[in-house]
A protein has these predicted regions:
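Gram-negative host-targeted secretion-system effectors, predominantly Type III and Type IV
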Residues: 1-2, 73
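Amphipathic, interaction-prone secondary-structure segments
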Residues: 42-99
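Acidic-basic catalytic patches of nuclease active cores, encompassing PD-(D/E)XK
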Residues: 26-49
Length: 240
């Protein structure tokens, strides 16, 4: 036991100036806390025992097509719909003026029937240029890290694990270029979420969609690797 050598004082430390705290280099070095968006979301997922299941996997040998994930929470059912398409290297840009992407995806409230799927397939790849459905809670798009993606597929197809150094340089297979919510481009308003049990926390629907995107990215590289070399292909080590 450690005994205090003197009285405990309740002296508040002065707040640092905003100009210091908000420096980009300083912000980039902050470690996640219990209040971080991702940690709050994954804690809710665990405590409420959310279940995410792939219920539709329609990709060709090169990994293009559509995939549907079902999300069951304690309160409701949602789906994340992903569309993967081929684009040239010249079309791949993270600039806001881009009009085509490797992936477009969204988080949908409720079931996805044939009519809704047809509407999403027609409009979601267009993003802001499309007529988006009001049951969409999140609308997003992403581009590949071509270097990482190709390296991961090649390694898995050869029966090996990718070199971790690739992730040290760019720690992703896909990077989102925009993640829209709260009524943007005609999707559901925040009023649909704020009184519910699932997505009342800030940015939680957006983080959920991106969480499923990460799961899709792994499933896609494994799928392509299996088609490239069925005899040797392995799955990605979860530690990566």
């Amino acid at each position: 036991m450690t005994l205090s050598s003197g009285p405990v004082t309740d002296t508040a430390l002065p707040l640092r100036p905003a100009a210091v705290v908000m420096e980009l280099e300083r912000l980039g070095s902050f470690s996640p806390t219990r209040l971080s968006f991702a940690r709050r979301l994954t804690r809710l997922m665990y405590q409420s025992r959310w279940h995410i299941t792939c219920v539709g996997f329609d990709l060709d040998d090169a990994g293009y097509g559509s995939v549907i994930y079902r999300l069951d929470t304690a309160a409701k059912r949602y789906h994340v719909v992903v569309f993967s398409r081929h684009i040239s290297d010249e079309q791949r840009t993270d600039r806001v003026i881009a009009d085509t992407w490797d992936l477009t995806f969204g988080l949908v409230e409720g079931e996805v029937d044939d009519a809704l799927m047809a509407s999403l397939e027609e409009n979601m790849p267009l993003q802001e240029a499309g007529r988006q459905h009001p049951r969409l809670l999140v609308l997003s798009r992403a581009n590949r890290s071509v270097r990482n993606f190709d390296a991961f597929v090649a390694a898995l197809a050869a029966g090996e694990q990718p070199d971790v150094s690739y992730l040290l340089e760019a720690g992703y297979l896909y990077r989102t270029t925009a993640v829209y919510g709260n009524g943007k481009f005609g999707i559901a308003d925040y009023d649909r979420l704020r009184t519910g049990a699932d997505f009342y926390q800030p940015f939680s629907p957006q983080m959920t969609a991106v969480y499923v995107l990460r799961e899709f990215s792994v499933a896609q590289v494994e799928h392509i690797a299996r088609h490239n070399n069925p005899a040797l292909a392995v799955t990605l080590d979860p530690d990566l």
